[in-house]
Swiss-Prot record:
Gene it is expressed from: dtd
Reactions catalysed according to its record: glycyl-tRNA(Ala) + H2O = tRNA(Ala) + glycine + H(+); a D-aminoacyl-tRNA + H2O = a tRNA + a D-alpha-amino acid + H(+)
Known partners and oligomeric status: Homodimer.
Taxon lineage: Bacteria, Pseudomonadati, Myxococcota, Myxococcia, Myxococcales
EC number(s) reported in the record: 3.1.1.96
Record-given protein name: D-aminoacyl-tRNA deacylase
Species this chain originates from: Anaeromyxobacter dehalogenans (strain 2CP-C)
Entries under InterPro entries matching the protein: Daa-tRNA_deacyls_DTD, DTD-like_sf
The protein's enzyme class: hydrolase
Length: 149
């Protein structure tokens, strides 16, 4: 499971012009599910997202997690994070999980974040979405449940 995590001052996702999810201060998480991911990957990623200290404390040091700043999380599914462009110029997506399995794990991550008391907004799985954000910092972190980076 891969995630691009961005600290945002605001973010929203639209489908057919309608806002399906929006947050103010918080995290925008672009989430890709791999073919061999399972419940353990979802748990690891949810735990890491909730605990990730990328918000500044009073001293200006990145020392606070999203809940500690009253932030929310916008999670958007993005299978293209599993794209492989090592050969040729068109990425292949064979490492991405099939839609049914990917959706189940995407929903699991969102549910686990909610269980931790976080407000979670989402996009629409498999929809053509437009994501708008203001990256605060900018701060962007790459996470991988297999710790590849």
């Amino acid at each position: 499971m891969r995630a691009v995590v961005q600290r945002v001052s605001r973010a929203e996702v639209r489908v057919d012009g309608a806002v399906t999810g929006a947050v103010g201060r918080g995290l925008l998480v672009l989430l890709g599910v791999a073919r061999d991911d399972g419940a353990q990957d979802a748990r690891l990623l949810a735990d890491k997202l909730a605990a990730l200290r990328i918000f500044e404390d009073a001293a200006g040091k990145m020392n606070l997690a999203v809940a500690e700043v009253g932030g929310a999380v916008l999670v958007v599914s993005q299978f293209t994070l599993l794209g492989d462009a090592r050969k040729g110029n068109r990425p292949g997506f064979s490492d991405a999980a099939p839609p049914e399995a990917a959706n189940a794990l995407y929903e699991a991550v969102c549910g686990m974040l909610r269980e931790k008391g976080l407000r979670v907004e989402t996009g629409v799985f498999r929809a053509d979405m437009q994501v708008e954000l203001v990256n605060d910092g900018p701060v962007t972190i790459l996470l991988d449940s297999r710790r590849l980076f």
